[in-house]
């Protein structure tokens, strides 16, 4: 079976941010660009049309793409970024308490979303791009329209008693349009699944032994993965609201993402990037930076995302770099 030989190899490193890369957004049509957010208070739009394969000193240390536009306006760390499905707009959330919608053709902020009382930690677009959801340290989840109007607040003093009892660190829409759903993870150690039509709690998923940093929903909307402080990834059946199994990552999980076309789950941990085959439940690869790290310089991956075709994994690091890993070992027979 061709899949058995597939592995990820380092294709290049991109330099542009000068602080932690917090999130990476990739276009769904595989256009040759990505957008990254950082603690340097900016977002970068990267042009990937001409990967420069001049491998320098370190093995694989080539420049892969170039930053061609920096998006500035946030006054604090930019914690998350996502793209609209047409690839024309980026949506960011920042510790300045605001969301911003950016026109990527001009680099201009077209909307500011003001309403959270504290840092915004996570943002997401619905499949049809008509709804936006955000999560914050103010313990609320807010649902917005694209005009920047807050339509509903879950949690907090006004949002009913079903909300989280801690910072809401991550929020994602399920791609399943038949059962419109939001999934949220929190420092209260729970993952909550919300019915998008009435913003009511569908189920409360408990089992983590520490705060939840990351949630991811599988491409078909059937599975949810969550991870955080306890170093264990829990896999949940979203339709049934029950835990399926756990995968031990061994250290704090900062980011999770499903491959779009393989039955793989990737976790960015304090130690390495772990890639599990969900069929066998085994780790198929353990990616570590190729450079030696001194004890006082913690270098680890903080953000992950796949290209839409599943051929490229983008990984953002604490030192501001983005590493690009490519699938190699394709079987071209048939």
Swiss-Prot record:
GO function term, MF aspect, one: translation regulator activity
Pfam families linked: WD40
SUPFAM superfamilies: WD40 repeat-like
Annotated keywords: Cell membrane, Cytoplasm, Membrane, Plant defense, Repeat, Ribonucleoprotein, Ribosomal protein, Transducer, WD repeat
A GO BP annotation: positive regulation of respiratory burst
Compartment(s): Cytoplasm; Cell membrane
One GO cellular component term noted in the UniProt record for this chain: ribosome
InterPro entries: G-protein_beta_WD-40_rep, RACK1-like, WD40/YVTN_repeat-like_dom_sf, WD40_repeat_CS, WD40_repeat_dom_sf, WD40_rpt
Tissues expressed in: Widely expressed.
Assembly information from the UniProt record: Interacts with RAC1, RAC3, RAC6, RAR1, SGT1 and RBOHB. Homodimer and heterodimer with RACK1B.
Similarity comment: family membership: Belongs to the WD repeat G protein beta family. Ribosomal protein RACK1 subfamily.
Cited function: Component of the RACK1 regulatory proteins that functions in innate immunity by interacting with multiple proteins in the RAC1 immune complex. Acts as a positive regulator of reactive oxygen species (ROS) production and is required for resistance against rice blast (M.grisea) infection.
Protein name: Small ribosomal subunit protein RACK1z
Organism lineage string: Eukaryota, Viridiplantae, Streptophyta, Embryophyta, Tracheophyta
Gene label: RACK1A
């Amino acid at each position: 079976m061709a899949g058995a030989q597939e592995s990820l190899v380092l294709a290049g490193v991109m330099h542009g941010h000068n602080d932690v890369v917090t999130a990476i957004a990739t276009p769904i049509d595989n256009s040759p660009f990505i957008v990254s957010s950082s603690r340097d208070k900016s977002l970068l739009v990267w042009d990937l049309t001409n990967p420069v394969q001049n491998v320098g000193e370190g093995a694989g240390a080539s420049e892969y793409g170039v930053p061609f536009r920096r998006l500035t306006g946030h006054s604090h760390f930019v914690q998350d970024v996502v793209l609209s499905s047409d690839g024309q707009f980026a949506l960011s959330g920042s510790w300045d308490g605001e969301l911003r919608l950016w026109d990527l053709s001009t680099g201009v902020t077209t909307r500011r979303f003001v309403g959270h009382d504290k840092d915004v930690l996570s943002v997401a677009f619905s499949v049809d791009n008509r709804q936006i959801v955000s999560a914050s340290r103010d313990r609320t989840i807010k649902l917005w329209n694209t005009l920047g109007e807050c339509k509903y607040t879950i949690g907090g003093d006004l949002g009913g008693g079903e909300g989280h009892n801690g910072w809401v660190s991550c929020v994602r829409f399920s791609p399943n349009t038949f059962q419109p759903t939001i999934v949220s993870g929190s420092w209260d150690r729970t993952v909550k699944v919300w019915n998008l039509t009435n913003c009511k709690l569908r189920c409360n998923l408990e089992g983590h032994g520490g705060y939840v940093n990351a949630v991811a929903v599988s491409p078909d909307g059937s599975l949810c993965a969550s991870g955080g402080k306890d170093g264990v990834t829990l896999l949940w059946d979203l339709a049934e609201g029950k835990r399926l199994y756990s995968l031990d990552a061994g250290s704090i999980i900062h980011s999770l993402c499903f491959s779009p076309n393989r039955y793989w789950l990737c976790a960015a941990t304090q130690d390495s990037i772990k890639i599990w085959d969900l069929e066998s439940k085994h780790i198929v690869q353990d990616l570590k930076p190729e450079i030696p790290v001194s004890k006082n310089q913690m270098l680890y991956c903080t953000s992950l995302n796949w290209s839409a075709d599943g051929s490229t994994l983008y990984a953002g690091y604490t030192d501001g770099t983005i590493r690009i890993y490519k699938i190699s070992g394709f079987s071209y027979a048939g």
